Design a protein with these regions (language model features):
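Membrane-embedded and interfacial regions of multi-pass energy-transducing membrane proteins
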Residues: 1-550, 554-645
């Protein structure tokens, strides 16, 4: 409750987002049960609307984004040679806001008012004229709360990456994951204010009688669509770029080759982010914007496929000629490359307005974005879990169980979503809760529903693997994979201070410089000539010879003598010196961020009382919780960050 350690906050993000992944998966399973056969009777039309709305909202805002945030928290300080993030308490605050916001959003299930307007909440369907109850209020307020969390984290990570890189860690030496995370933070801080404006307008229309989206009063429902998709399409890259970064860490390690075209990978990520703000209206070709607007946004949609395609080929060339090791993490990474390509091809089709008009709001679109976000984002994130689990926990995951997880999930994803292309082309609209016999959709829907069973089995095995391996997995050591970046130079799990001495970096692959200099002979280094980085671990020198760092007398705790492909030979663990013993100042734990987040959430949620015709109660509650939040914030600001050493 009081931690401000970025690694523990990463664990909190990971556990919470995986819990909501199960909840979102349950919602999807009920949807597929309803659609498995014609005229399904599993749920009512009203419940179906709530299920698909909350499934989309949960998977995007409560699963993929915070699961990416777990990796941001764990890896960014470790990869840049920092001891923590720039603002540790703000980091804790962003997690607690996410937790309380996600709980608030899902409380709606228990009061019979789950959001039911679709995850992009088109007006006027979400205005009071068509939605009288609290359903949309929970959605509007919940997303505003979650937006505060995302913005706080975004500014924190931008500051961390700019200001806290180790000596010699120039921008063009940062690991690709940190680069993609850096780009994502700019997307967040630029995109989330737009959706906040849209939500505030809708909130004012619903709560205070304004007319931003009310047609009869001169409002414009298309304003919502423009504002939402100016946020919504960059959001796609907020969801996928972290997975791209993880894949760009996994493939070089298990190919035993540096990443092909590192600068191009960086610039393509920047270009994707830049162009991502110029393609939003391809979601709106069906609303009648006119031929000029359709042409402009169609061309922009074609252009954004270029930097994305560059990444695909760079990953392929990274593996080409390498010594490949097909670990579970590698399987997930390769699968992202293959399946995201399918999602990209089905997506660039919609750069053509005539084709888009035929496919809009059909299951073809559902197939497309699930190939991007499940076969793309989730495959990459699962690969990241398998790759970094040893660093999180100090234990190895079971590769046999990992293979079962991968293959069942792989089969399930393709069996679920590939047939949706055809049901969509045969004319099946999305969001219908039942369909008649004889439409030609029966086989495709049954296959999609069977595929969910495979996904459930795969995820269940994966979760069992995660839970079991925390305690009984093989000891990992510092670097079980023979990886090239700084995070693998320190003990697993890392000490609270990360690095006993801040390392000096002379190339993109500091550990390969130490362990396998032949692999980095063509990588640019600093002007220090042939001198290689000497990473300090736990107060001890790592050494420079051999493929993997050895464990000399008095050497680092848990260092591995493993060469890829050979059995792991862990070192018996010994106690690491504490930050106090080493004289390293570290931020103190604090409960204040939790209180600020709690009272802020309660302040937002108090507005619900307005729709119960209890305006005076709402005012009293808002003022009370705002005062409590302000008092907690003063306590936060007046408490010293660190003890004096």
């Amino acid at each position: 409750l009081t931690t401000v350690d970025h690694k523990r906050i990463a664990a909190l993000y990971l556990g919470t987002s995986l819990f909501w992944f199960l909840a979102g998966g349950l919602e999807a399973s009920i949807i597929r049960a309803q659609l498995a056969f014609p005229n399904g009777k599993v749920v009512s039309a009203e419940m179906f609307n709530e299920l698909f709305t909350m499934h989309g909202t949960t998977m995007i805002f409560l699963v993929v984004m915070p699961l990416s945030a777990a990796f941001f928290n764990l890896l960014i300080p470790l990869q840049i040679g920092a001891r923590d993030v720039a603002f540790p308490r703000l980091n804790a605050f962003s997690y607690w806001v996410y937790l309380f916001g996600s709980i608030f959003l899902n409380v709606s299930w228990f009061v019979g008012s789950a959001p039911d307007g679709g995850w992009f909440g088109y007006t006027p369907l979400t205005t009071l004229a068509y939605s009288h109850n609290l359903n949309i209020d929970f959605w509007v307020l919940g997303l505003q709360i979650l937006g505060v969390s995302s913005l706080a984290a975004g500014f924190n990570f931008i500051t961390t990456i700019i200001n806290m890189r180790a000596p010699g860690m120039y921008f063009m030496r940062m690991p690709i994951f940190t680069w993609m995370a850096f780009i994502v933070q700019f997307l967040i801080v630029l995109a989330f204010p737009v959706i906040t404006i849209a939500l505030v307008f809708l909130q004012f229309d619903r709560f205070f009688g304004t007319n931003f989206y009310e047609i009869a009063q001169g409002g414009d429902p298309l304003l919502w669509q423009h504002l939402f998709w100016i946020f919504g399409h960059p959001e796609v890259y907020i969801l996928i770029l972290p997975a791209f970064g993880l894949v760009s860490e996994i493939l070089p390690t298990f190919s035993r080759k540096p990443l092909f075209g590192y600068p191009v990978m960086v610039y393509s990520g920047m270009l994707i982010a830049f162009l991502g703000f110029g393609v939003w209206a391809h979601h709106m070709f069906a609303v009648g914007m006119g031929p000029i607007a359709d042409t402009v946004f169609g061309v922009m949609t074609m252009l954004i496929a270029i930097p994305t395609g560059v990444k695909i080929f760079n990953w392929i060339f990274t593996m080409w000629g390498g010594v490949l090791r097909f670990t579970t993490a590698m399987k997930f990474a390769i699968t992202l490359v293959a399946l995201f390509t399918i999602g990209g091809i089905s997506g660039v089709m919609h750069a053509s307005p005539p084709a888009d008009l035929q496919q809009t709001d059909t299951y073809f679109i559902v197939a497309h974005f699930h190939y991007v976000l499940v076969a793309g984002s989730m495959m990459g994130l699962f690969g990241g879990v398998y790759y970094y689990f040893p660093k999180f926990t100090g234990r190895m995951l079971d590769e046999t169980l990992g293979s079962w997880h991968f293959w069942l999930f792989f089969i399930g994803v393709n069996l679920t979503f590939f047939p949706m292309h055809f049901s969509g082309l045969y004319g099946m609209p999305r969001r219908i809760y039942r369909y008649d016999v004889g439409q030609g959709w029966e086989t495709f829907n049954l296959l999609s529903s069977i595929g969910v069973i495979f996904q459930i089995l795969g995820v269940a095995i994966g979760f069992w693997n995660f839970w079991r391996s925390r305690n009984v997995g093989a000891i990992a050591g510092n670097d079980p994979w023979g990886a090239p970046t700084l995070e693998w130079s320190i003990p697993s799990p890392p000490p609270d201070y990360n690095f006993a001495r801040v390392p000096t970096v002379t190339s993109r692959y500091p550990l390969w410089d130490v362990k396998s200099p032949a692999l980095t002979s063509e990588i640019p280094h600093s002007r220090l000539g042939e001198e290689r980085v000497e990473v300090e671990v736990g107060g001890h020198h790592t050494g420079k010879v051999g493929h993997a760092i050895g464990n000399p007398p008095g050497g680092p705790v848990g260092a591995s003598t493993r060469v890829p492909g050979s059995p792991l030979t862990p070192v018996p663990p010994r106690r690491l010196p504490t930050a106090h013993e080493l004289g390293i100042p570290m931020p103190n734990p604090s409960i204040k961020p939790l209180f600020v987040a709690l009272f802020m959430t309660l302040m937002f949620s108090s507005l619900i009382a307005i729709h119960k015709d209890k305006v005076q109660l709402a005012v009293v509650l808002v003022i009370t919780f705002a005062g409590a939040m302000t008092a907690s914030l003063y306590g936060w600001l007046l408490t010293p960050l660190e003890d004096e050493h």
